[in-house]
């Protein structure tokens, strides 16, 4: 009989796609684990083995995103990220090189097979309840109230003149509008509004580009990695913030290596100076522009240019060039505070470290928590207070998170997974507490290890 990796007693594992109709080679996990190298990457989906080494560069989500799942069972990630599985499976066919040996488990390592099976049943139940179908009226109203705020801000300045009161009110209204734009483009980026991915991405380019001045491709490049491997160093861009801030396991590592680029034991204090005020205004603006130029995203660049043109044409007649620039900076700083506090309250206080190769549900729950819902918090946070549900089901429209939450709670209770829900203010305070704890750990390791 043929050995593992040999369809019928051949000399070894077959490289390249399996010929149509030929018996598929079989592989063990110990073989698959060897293919997690630059230029040599395999992954497993529904027990079938795919060689993505060359194709990864053409992956619509980016080579880094799909590469984060190399040498792993990517079945649940595959289902989580894609709407039309029948369509995307066509791209898998040429990459198929074999399947897992019959005696091999579907997942590598010490993963809980019953937990994984129950999570897939949970997803199927959500699909049967039609929780992945969007209410387009809900999202139309969201877009409408964003546009209404843009108009209201301009009318305030137009009718009252560019005085302090009208200018401050306009800046606040524009900042709220920009914050809600983040939420709406986030929905579109996850393809959770329209039935076709293409429609979502075209609409996202409009919202992200014309209404915000950023690149939709840049956002997706960053954000999809965050969803694939939340709170994992070198895979989640949101926690790759050293040497400015130390989070999770990096605190001990920097301390032991005697690295002191900043007074990390005071990072919970300087966070207020360079975190919330500057993330959107400085870091995102620079990173976004660099991405569009380096990756030659000219369409996104034109969309972004249309935002800046509209903004300056709208307000320069009242403020002049310098005053309009100051208004823009004020809006960016205000929205930056919203962005940092709202997006990080669910993640920074949670487990942050190196890859542990958990199953999809366990990895998401280890890195996320919820915030107590209310009509205001749901709106203000763009439903990111339901971060657990969002991370488990990224393509689910956010207006259905409340409906799926009881099913998720029951699933977590059955398997002993921590379904954490915090009051809003507690979640915000925990960000500072987490930064202080990491700084203290760094100082102890720096002085004593």
UniProtKB/Swiss-Prot annotation:
GO terms for biological process: gene expression; lipid metabolic process; sphingolipid metabolic process; unsaturated fatty acid biosynthetic process. A motif (Histidine box-2) lies at residues 223-227. The chain crosses the membrane at residues 138-158, 164-184, 269-289, 311-331. Keywords: Electron transport, Endoplasmic reticulum, Fatty acid biosynthesis, Fatty acid metabolism, Lipid biosynthesis, Lipid metabolism, Membrane, Oxidoreductase, Transmembrane, Transmembrane helix, Transport. It is found in: Endoplasmic reticulum membrane. A motif (Histidine box-3) lies at residues 387-391. Its EC number is 1.14.19.-. Mammals have different sphingoid bases that differ in their length and/or pattern of desaturation and hydroxyl groups. The predominant sphingoid base that comprises mammalian ceramides is sphing-4-enine (sphingosine or SPH) which has a trans (E) desaturation at carbon 4. FADS3 is a desaturase that introduces a cis (Z) double bond between carbon 14 and carbon 15 of the sphingoid base (also known as long chain base, LCB), producing LCBs such as sphinga-4,14-dienine (SPD, d18:2(4E,14Z)) from SPH. Prefers SPH-containing ceramides (N-acylsphing-4-enines) as substrates. The protein sequence includes a number of characteristic features of microsomal fatty acid desaturases including the three histidine boxes (these domains may contain the active site and/or be involved in metal ion binding), and the N-terminal cytochrome b5 domain containing the heme-binding motif, HPGG, similar to that of other fatty acid desaturases. This is Fatty acid desaturase 3. It comes from Rattus norvegicus (Rat).
């Amino acid at each position: 009989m043929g050995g593992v990796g040999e369809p019928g007693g051949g000399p070894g594992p077959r490289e390249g796609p399996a010929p149509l109709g030929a018996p598929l080679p079989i592989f063990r996990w110990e073989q698959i684990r060897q293919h997690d190298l630059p230029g040599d990457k395999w992954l497993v989906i529904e027990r079938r083995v795919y060689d993505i080494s060359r194709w990864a560069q053409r992956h619509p989500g980016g080579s880094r995103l799909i590469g984060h799942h190399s040498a792993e069972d990517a079945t649940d990630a595959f289902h989580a990220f894609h709407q039309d599985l029948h369509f995307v499976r066509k791209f898998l066919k040429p990459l198929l090189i074999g399947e897992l040996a019959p005696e091999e488990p579907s997942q590598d390592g010490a993963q809980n097979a019953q937990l994984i099976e129950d999570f897939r049943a949970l997803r199927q139940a959500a699909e049967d309840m039609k929780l992945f179908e969007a209410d387009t009226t809900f999202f139309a109203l969201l877009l409408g109230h964003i546009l209404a705020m843009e108009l209201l801000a301009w009318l305030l300045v137009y009718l009252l003149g560019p005085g302090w009161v009208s200018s401050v009110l306009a800046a606040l209204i524009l900042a709220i509008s920009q914050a809600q734009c983040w939420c709406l483009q986030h929905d579109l980026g996850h393809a959770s509004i329209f039935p076709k991915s293409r429609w979502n991405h075209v609409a996202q380019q409009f919202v992200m580009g014309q209404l915000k001045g950023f690149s939709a491709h840049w956002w997706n490049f960053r954000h999809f990695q965050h969803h694939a491997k939340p709170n994992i160093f070198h895979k989640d861009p949101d926690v790759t913030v050293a040497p400015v801030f130390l989070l999770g396991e990096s605190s001990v590592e920097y301390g032991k290596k005697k690295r002191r680029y900043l007074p990390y034991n005071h990072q919970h204090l300087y966070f207020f100076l360079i975190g919330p005020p500057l993330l959107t205004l400085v870091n995102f603006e620079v990173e976004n522009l660099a991405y569009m130029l380096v990756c030659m995203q000219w369409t996104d660049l034109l969309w972004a240019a249309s935002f800046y043109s509209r903004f300056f044409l709208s307000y320069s007649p009242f403020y002049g060039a310098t005053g309009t620039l100051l208004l823009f900076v004020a809006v960016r700083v205000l929205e930056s505070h919203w962005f940092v506090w709202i997006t990080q309250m669910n993640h920074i206080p949670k487990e942050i470290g190196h890859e542990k190769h958990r199953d999809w549900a366990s990895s998401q729950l280890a890195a996320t928590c919820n915030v107590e819902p209310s009509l205001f918090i749901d709106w203000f946070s763009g439903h990111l207070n339901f971060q657990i549900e969002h991370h488990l089901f990224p393509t689910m429209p956010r207006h259905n998170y409340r409906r799926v939450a009881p099913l998720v709670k029951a699933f977590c209770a059955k398997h002993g997974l921590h379904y954490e829900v915090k009051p809003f203010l507690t979640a915000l305070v925990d960000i500072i507490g987490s930064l202080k704890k990491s700084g203290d750990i760094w100082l102890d390791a720096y002085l004593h290890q």
